[in-house]
Regions:
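S-adenosyl-L-methionine-dependent methyltransferase catalytic module, highlighting the catalytic core
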Residues: 112-117, 124-218
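Short conserved loop adjoining the S-adenosyl-L-methionine
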Residues: 87-93
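Class I SAM-dependent methyltransferase "Motif I" SAM/SAH-binding loop
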Residues: 41-43
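A short SAM/SAH-binding and catalytic strip from SAM-dependent methyltransferases
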Residues: 98-109
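Class I SAM-dependent methyltransferase SAM/SAH-binding core
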Residues: 46, 50-87
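Class I SAM-dependent methyltransferase Rossmann-like catalytic core
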Residues: 5-19
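Conserved alpha-helix/loop element of class I SAM-dependent methyltransferases that forms part
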Residues: 17-34
Length: 219
């Protein structure tokens, strides 16, 4: 999800935003021309650069890694150096149409607090995360008795940045409890069995990666 890959046979010289076409369509449905986009943990700025080229968006990234910040500057992507664990207090309410949080929520010390802060500054939030409820993770933990590792979660338990792992069901229940509306949701799978499980409706068991677009429920 949210990796910028180049497929010139399909897009000419413009890179696609997602490896999964469903997710690409889902996100772009919430991005109009000249939309104000905030990319939290923007990396080298490739996503914002692509959206700027495709949709003429007004984008800004937040990143703490200095090398990534330099890459953003070389791509002419506006970027702020900031640690997301310290919040977004210096950003005004309703400053953005959409915020993007890509594979980052599970790394935060206060995931709920960050979500609330993001929804203060943006109307919609697009979140991607690895689903800890996937069948392969469950079976690995059951039969091996150790913290599972996968392509999405490749770290050892003692050096992982993922300090708040959660499942798809955990996420939907959090949204219900906090009065958040799930506008759209998409799933991406590499494994055939994961695709089958997701296809028959067992999404918490089948989904490997999740993209959700959320907003505050209107009072």
């Amino acid at each position: 999800f949210l990796n910028v890959s180049v497929d010139k046979s399909k897009t000419g010289n413009i890179p696609t935003i997602f490896s999964d076409g469903v997710a690409l369509k889902l996100l772009q449905g919430f991005i109009h021309e000249k939309a104000r986009i905030l990319d939290l943990g923007c990396g080298d700025g490739s996503l914002l650069a692509t959206l700027k080229q495709q949709k003429q968006i007004q984008g800004i990234g937040i990143e703490k890694d200095e090398k990534s910040i330099l890459s953003c500057i070389h791509k002419d992507v506006p970027v702020l150096q900031k640690d997301l664990d310290k919040g977004l207090n210096d950003i005004a309410e309703n400053s953005f149409d959409l915020a993007i949080l890509n594979r980052t929520l599970q790394e935060m010390r206060d995931p709920l607090g960050l979500l609330q802060e993001i929804l203060r500054v943006a109307k919609y939030v697009a979140i991607t995360f690895p689903n800890f409820g996937n069948w392969s993770i469950r079976t690995a933990l059951l039969f091996r008795g150790r913290m599972p590792k996968s392509k999405e979660l490749p770290y050892e338990w003692y050096n992982t940045p993922n300090i708040h792992l959660f499942t798809l069901r955990d996420f939907t229940r959090l949204c219900e409890k906090q009065g958040l509306k799930v506008e759209k949701m998409a799933f991406e799978n590499n494994g055939s069995f994961s695709k089958i499980l997701t296809g028959v409706g067992l999404k918490n068991l089948g989904a490997e990666r999740v993209l959700a677009i959320i907003s505050k429920k209107e009072s």
